[in-house]
Swiss-Prot record:
NCBIfam families (UniProt xref): PRK11031.1
Keyword flag Hydrolase: yes
Signal peptide feature range: none
Pathway: Purine metabolism; ppGpp biosynthesis; ppGpp from GTP: step 2/2
Entry EC number(s): 3.6.1.40
UniProt KW keywords: Hydrolase
Species in which this protein is naturally found: Escherichia coli O6:H1 (strain CFT073 / ATCC 700928 / UPEC)
Single GO biological process annotation from the record: guanosine pentaphosphate catabolic process
CDD domains: ASKHA_NBD_EcGppA-like
SUPFAM superfamilies the record matches: Actin-like ATPase domain, HD-domain/PDEase-like
Protein name: Guanosine-5'-triphosphate,3'-diphosphate pyrophosphatase
Source lineage: Bacteria, Pseudomonadati, Pseudomonadota, Gammaproteobacteria, Enterobacterales
Length: 494
């Protein structure tokens, strides 16, 4: 029993899919062991009297039999099972739940829309980086949750009865992706939103985060098409035109859209367009977690840290036994360089955060081997779970670590889309120089330096006589100037 007592499971009986998340608590953080998702489409089994059909209930029970096998090893006090919109609505929900509890061997709780919204917000707060004041949007199968909050505290919570399955049945029942169907779906969604829009706007937000299958699908489409990961109304309208061009649901083909997500994509898209329009949202990114993560973190009683990224970096440093003093030393030199060139290069605050994060992890590759350490570092960062960092930011970190030394692979810096290619090049230059000047691993051996930028030309001024007193240092810097010149990055060192 010992090894399973640190396991926790969260199950969410959604209107479109049933999900199970099994995690292990490791040093105040969670490690995902299992994620199982089955499209049960429970909401599609509701008739006009809100009764669930026997077929839909059987689909649900069948899925729970799979989940039950995995739950046998976990203490019941460490399992939470919640049911959402469809089972809130269904007049015969009691029949479904009685049998579900029998199959799973633990209680199933039907939670209110507000409680669902609160849990979603907690899941986002624990796993998503960025500004503290946020609006969270989760489009489910039969309900849509909208929550504003600051840090761990929610300021307003709404659960609206519209979702991608119910809107599919209502506005795309004929499987026709015409303009009229989209117009009707958007108009109806805006009417549902209108009564709550003022309060959401009153509380306000600095960032907007999406936490649902629809937003996940959009992210996959944009990554597949090489776009940056920010969701904007313009991109949503382009995708709508693409869907209209396809004509029918069974013919819907968009690069990066999986068959599994395609069925409810147009209805989810219509709801999201309505939300963007009604609330005047400029830009949305994908959340790191939502309802299931909220359940798990709730069971673990872990507090929400102000800075998720810092917690992630600390955990990774401990796990891979990275020399934290050296990571801080490189970060300090890089920050000093960054602050000197930031105005000339018009860099944004997020770029500084990502550069410092790369410094914190730059030696992770040594945990595999000194040989090819940059390649090992890039592989690890690309494949590790890094709460607080978006997929595009992870890719940028991996690319910076790949190019921390040796000749520069310019194409890799251009293939990430977290920042413009030119910014990726600039961050790479600063990281490489910081690593060189902190390489003696002692604070008192880092020279006083000034770094000036004039367009792409970097001029580094060292203390008088430093180069003659440090022949190895001079050799390394000469080699670096040469490598930077190969990719047209002019570097002068005095």
């Amino acid at each position: 029993m010992g090894s399973t007592s640190s396991l926790y499971a969260a199950i969410d009986l959604g209107s479109n899919s049933f999900h199970m998340l099994v995690v292990r608590e490791v040093a105040g953080s969670i490690q995902t062991l299992t994620r199982i998702k089955r499209k049960v489409r429970l909401a599609a089994g509701l008739n006009s009297e809100n009764a669930l059909s026997n077929e839909a209930m059987e689909r649900g029970w069948q899925c729970l039999r799979l989940f039950a096998e995995r739950l046998q090893d976990i203490p019941p006090s460490q399992i939470r099972v919640v049911a959402t919109a469809t089972l809130r609505l269904a007049v015969n929900a009691g029949d479904f739940i009685a049998k579900a509890q029998e199959i799973l061997g633990c209680p199933v709780q039907v939670i209110s829309g507000e409680e669902e919204a609160r849990l979603i917000y907690q899941g986002v707060a624990h796993t998503t980086g960025g500004a503290d004041q946020r609006l969270v949007v989760d489009i489910g199968g039969a309900s849509t949750e909208l929550v504003t909050g600051t840090g761990a505290q929610t300021t307003s919570l709404f659960s609206l009865s519209m979702g991608c399955v119910t809107w599919l049945e209502r506005y795309f029942a004929d499987r026709n992706l015409g303009q009229e169907n989209f117009d009707a779906a958007e108009k109806a969604a805006r009417e549902v939103l209108r009564p709550v829009a003022d309060e959401l706007r009153y509380h306000g937000w600095k960032v907007c985060v999406g936490a649902s299958g629809t937003v996940q699908a959009l992210q996959e489409i944009m990554m597949a098409q090489g776009m940056d990961e920010r969701i904007t109304l313009e991109k949503l309208q382009q995708l709508k035109q693409r869907a209209i061009h396809c004509g029918r649901l069974e013919e819907l083909e968009i690069d990066g859209l999986t068959l599994e997500r395609a069925l409810v994509f147009p209805s989810g898209l219509a709801i999201l367009i309505a939300i963007f329009t009604e609330l005047n949202i400029q830009c949305m990114t994908l959340a790191g977690g939502a309802l299931r993560e909220g359940l798990v973190y709730g069971m673990l009683h872990l507090t929400v840290e102000q800075d998720i990224r810092s917690r992630t970096l600390r955990n990774i440093q401990r796990r891979f036994m990275i020399d934290i003093d050296q990571a801080q030393r490189v970060a300090k030199v890089a920050a000093n360089f960054y602050d000197q060139v930031e105005n000339e290069w018009h860099l944004e605050a997020i770029s500084r955060d990502l550069l410092i994060s790369a410094c914190q992890l730059h030696e992770i590759g040594l945990s595999v081997d000194f040989k090819q350490a940059p390649q090992h570092a890039a592989y690890l960062v690309r494949n590790l779970d890094l709460p607080g960092f978006t997929p595009a930011q992870k890719k940028l970190l991996a690319t910076l670590l790949l190019n921390q030394t040796n000749p520069v692979d310019l194409s890799s810096l251009h293939q990430q889309n977290a920042v413009p290619p030119r910014v990726a090049e600039q961050l790479c230059r600063l990281l490489r120089l910081a690593i060189i000047f902190a390489s003696r691993r002692r604070d008192d051996l880092v020279p006083e330096m000034t770094l000036q930028a004039n367009h792409e030309l970097l001029t580094l001024t060292l203390p008088q006589g430093w180069l003659t007193q440090h022949p190895l240092g001079k050799e390394i810097i000469d080699q670096e100037s040469q490598w930077q010149s190969y990719v047209h990055w002019p570097l002068e060192v005095h």
